[in-house]
Amino acid sequence: MRRTFTPRGAISGFILGAAVMALAGCGSTPPADITLAPQSSPAASTPEKVGDLATERIKWASNKPGCEGDCPRIEIDSVAFPGIPKLTALVDHVLAYMTGTDANRRGPYDTLSEYTQYFWSTARPRDATYFKASVKDTVGDVVSIELHTEQFLTGAAHGIPATQYLNWERSRGRVMSLDEALIPGRRGQYVAALQRAHAKWLEQNPDARRDPAAYGKMWPFQESDNFALTRDGIVVKYDAYSIAPYSHGEPELSIPYADLRGILKPELLPQP
């Protein structure tokens, strides 16, 4: 049986809106800005270097305060950007927003700290939420970030995962959308390249090989704007239950640069 959560496009649209609006800036409650790596909690942050980009790995975890036995739990494994506070704040904001994969559970919060307070007041004994953010790659001016959440609800058969990519342009201080990365008018060619990548992915999918017609009817190709620019091309991520059953996780399709010439803007292609 297929299950449907909030469409990926809804999350992507919010993220771009948040970027346009230029979002600024261990115990029972994480630091007010968990991803800002407060100096008062040095053990929770670890400086790291990704290419020429300075980052800090931020970790925090807690059960519900005062709870014994089966307790609600939150774990955060995020990333901060000491030289780009706007990006640090955006990562925090988007991770919190991504808990709205189930529209009925979207609460009045905008940061991880606010989400934590909401979660402690509403969670059932075995509920848990896991947050993870990391740099996927850096390509020239662009920093690609992978944001992931997974929610485990008491009584549910399995977790609800969600993954979102952000492509941050350092020179412009903003998120780059897919349409901004494509040459104007080349959206159709991008979709065709994505379909070819999907066809290659199906060739390696034992369920699809077993009964291609039935699989294609149940799990047809879909477009996606959820992309990350990497040194090998672009990677496109899909939600669970979108183009494959839950057992396949969140499928990922790769389009090499060789298939993106004449589609992706020249300044984003590898230079000879």
What role is predicted for each listed range?
Residues 27-272:
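Compositionally biased intrinsically disordered regions enriched in Thr/Gly
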